[in-house]
Regions:
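Short, hydrophobic/aromatic-enriched beta-strand segments in well-ordered soluble domains
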Residues: 1, 13, 47-62, 100-108, ...
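Short coil/turn motif common to extracellular beta-sandwich-like domains
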Residues: 2-8
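A surface-exposed beta-strand-loop module
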Residues: 6, 13-71, 128
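Aromatic/His-enriched, Gly/Pro-containing loop or helix-boundary segments
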Residues: 8, 22-45, 78-87, 232-253
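Generic beta-strand hydrophobic packing signal
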Residues: 9, 14, 19-21, 102, ...
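The feature marks proteins involved in alpha-glucan
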Residues: 70-80
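Hydrophobic helix-coil surface modules that form long, contiguous segments used
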Residues: 79-82, 90-252
Length: 254
């Protein structure tokens, strides 16, 4: 609010290792107050400035399954309601809307699939057997809708065409060996997308829509922007053993 006197910037953070803070490429004063990073003496006026915060965290020790965590040697996020503050210092409130550009780098054999919200802008190989993927979400969103996934996953894919003639890619990612259990989830996703467009005139606003299934997920389903993360019970259905209730549950959640 330009009519309010300048105040300290307080950013939420939990269980983070802070390396450094920079403003417009230079050092700046800060302090830690409980679970907040407090920045003072920021540039005055209404001019924008660049704030860079370098942090690390340990997802392998994150037993809360909130923020960035490891499940079966893969990385997942759960940011609702206040999990993003466990990834980096941020204004972790639902009224703060921002666009995100995310670059993921990892060992290509251990983590061949690198996902985040939005559209895949670029991907490629790096040195020492590593690779990268760069994602950009052009739509502003609260940080609790941020998502990240990295691991050994395979995908069922389906291309669809909206009423405007634009092509979109639908993907359902699962563990290797579970791909044959994803047909109903994909059919449910296609039906959901078609219904949104027919009923409300709302086509997909991204180039792709992704669902990822994991067994260690404490929310059942999390509808992150463009990258939904679901518990496997709401994605996987073996036609030989699943009940009508299982199929109905998948359709209702997807």
């Amino acid at each position: 609010n330009p009519d309010v006197a300048a105040q300290s910037l307080r950013l939420d953070g939990e269980e983070l290792n802070l390396a450094r803070v920079m403003v417009n490429g230079g050092g700046t004063s800060f302090k830690i107050d409980g679970n907040q990073l407090v920045l003072e003496n920021l540039p005055e006026g209404n001019d924008a400035f660049d704030l860079e915060i370098f942090t690390t965290c340990d997802p392998s020790k994150n037993t809360q399954l909130s923020g960035l965590y490891v499940s079966n040697e893969s990385f997942f996020t759960q940011c609702e309601a206040e999990g993003f503050r466990r990834i980096t210092y941020f204004l972790d409130r639902p009224d703060v809307m921002a666009s995100y550009t995310v670059t993921l780098r990892a060992d290509a054999q251990k983590y061949p699939v690198l996902l985040s919200n939005g559209n895949l802008l670029e991907q490629g190989k790096l040195e020492d057997g590593r690779h990268f993927a760069k994602w950009i979400d052009p739509h502003k969103k609260p940080c609790y809708l941020f998502a990240l996934v990295a691991g050994q996953l395979v995908a069922r894919e389906q291309r669809i065409v909206s009423r405007s003639g634009k092509e979109h890619l639908l993907q359902v990612f699962v563990r290797p060996g579970d791909l044959d259990k994803t047909e109903h989830a994909m059919n449910s996703l296609m039906a959901s997308v078609a219904w949104d467009e027919a009923r409300f005139g709302l086509p997909l606003d991204l180039e792709r829509f992704m669902i990822v299934a994991t067994s260690d997920f404490n929310m059942g389903a999390m509808e992150n922007k463009g990258l939904n993360i679901f518990n496997t019970k709401f994605v996987l259905a073996n036609p030989a053993t699943a009940t009508d209730y299982d199929f109905a549950s998948i359709e209702s959640v997807v």
